[in-house]
């Protein structure tokens, strides 16, 4: 068996991606950062009262809500979530993250794609 390379990526080392309402995201595991990966991982903080643009990814998305509560607005209504919940968003599903609470929502998310996947926005 060949040598295994394990990558460690510090949150602060990834570029901050600004989102609406003071929210932000960082892509931690990507092809540029670790290379040879088949999946990607990111970290987001959604500020109280914020809402993202509605997006649809070419691949499924999974997420874990570390803390806070809010909802996903989808084409079929809304889905509530809170800290400790895991989310599975099928590919092609339109969704927006809405923090309708008075505290931050912290979420870790991933895709079966080596980078942030091709995405439509509306």
Language model feature labels by segment:
Residues 34, 102-103:
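Short strand-connecting beta-turns/loops that link adjacent beta-strands
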Residues 58, 77, 93-94, 103:
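A generic "binding-loop/recognition-motif" signal
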Residues 58-70, 75:
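Glycine- and acidic-residue-biased ligand/ion/polar-headgroup-sensing regions
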Residues 76-92:
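Short acidic-glycine-tyrosine-enriched beta hairpin
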């Amino acid at each position: 068996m060949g040598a295994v390379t394990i990558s460690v990526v510090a949150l602060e080392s990834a570029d901050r991606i600004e989102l609406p309402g003071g929210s932000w995201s960082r892509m931690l595991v990507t092809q540029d950062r670790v290379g040879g990966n088949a999946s990607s991982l990111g970290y987001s903080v959604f500020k109280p009262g914020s809402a993202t643009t509605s997006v649809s990814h070419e691949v499924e998305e999974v997420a874990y809500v570390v803390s806070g509560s809010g909802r996903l607005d989808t084409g079929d209504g809304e889905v509530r979530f809170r800290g400790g919940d895991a989310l599975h968003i099928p590919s092609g599903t339109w969704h927006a993250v809405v923090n309708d609470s008075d505290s931050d929502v912290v979420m870790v998310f991933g895709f079966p794609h080596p980078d942030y996947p091709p995405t439509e926005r509306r």
